Amino acid sequence: MKRYNAKRKTHRNLKSIKKLIPTVLALLAFVSLLAGIITLHNPKTLPFRQIKITVSSDHIKMAELKDIVVHHIQGGFFSFNASALQTALMSLPWVHDVSVRRIWPNELEIQVEEQRPIARWNQNELITQEGEIFSPPIETIPQNIPQLSGPNDSEENVLNRFQQFSQLLIPFHAAVTALSLTKRGAWSLILNGHTQIFLGRENIDQRFEQFVHLYPKIIGANINRVEHVDLRYSNGLAIQWKN
């Protein structure tokens, strides 16, 4: 009888142990996973051995980029905060876009794209072909680009007009060097840095097309002798010649 009871007790113990096995295995798996996560987030795990910064720029200093990168390299391949570095680099006024890429097992590749302004906007800002306005240090603003100006929130309209007028003038080798929109909605532009064109507030497309049509016939090679052209008349235009 005692032997029978001992067998039953042993059998119960084995069943209890078997029931615990899945729990123990799950616990071991969790501990292993936790240890792996801790290891991956350890800054000493797979630290970067090579950092490559690529930038084609006249206004972004490599030394400034390196300072920001060094400040944000606080982790290894897995723990490194790429988003924080990208945000920091994007805060530089001349930076248009930033790409941060990790290359296994210990390389970091950073590509920085510079803003490409096509004109100056109002006083101390620049505008890109996509209509993005940014404010770089005044001393870095190029002096040989067109000047666009207009009221707040008019930059898209002014930029579209600038591109439209510039395209129409290509056959005549004339360039729009300034374009202005007043608060009252009046348009004027300057060609080749010296000849002013007044378009007024109404029928802008019609008036400019009239100017383009008459340009080779009346102005053409004499553009340097023209002070201004006034297209604000319902029938015709007025030309002021230089003395």
UniProtKB/Swiss-Prot annotation:
Record-level GO BP terms: division septum assembly; FtsZ-dependent cytokinesis
Q: Tell me, how does this one assemble? A: Part of a complex composed of FtsB, FtsL and FtsQ.
Query: Which parts of the chain does the record assign to the membrane side Periplasmic?
Result: 41-243
Q: What does this protein do?
A: Essential cell division protein. May link together the upstream cell division proteins, which are predominantly cytoplasmic, with the downstream cell division proteins, which are predominantly periplasmic. May control correct divisome assembly.
List the membrane topology term(s).
Single-pass type II membrane protein
Q: Where are the transmembrane segments?
A: 20-40
Q: Say where the protein is mainly found.
A: membrane
Name where it's found.
Answer: Cell inner membrane
> Can you quote a single GO CC term?
cell division site
What keywords sit in the KW lines?
A: Cell cycle, Cell division, Cell inner membrane, Cell membrane, Membrane, Transmembrane, Transmembrane helix
Q: Which domain of life is it from?
A: Bacteria
Organism of origin: Coxiella burnetii (strain RSA 493 / Nine Mile phase I)
Residues in the Cytoplasmic compartment per record: 1-19
Domain spans labelled POTRA = 46-115
HAMAP family in UniProt: FtsQ_subfam
Q: What is this protein called?
A: Cell division protein FtsQ
Q: Disulfide connectivity?
A: none
Q: Spell out the family assignment given in the record's similarity comment.
A: Belongs to the FtsQ/DivIB family. FtsQ subfamily.
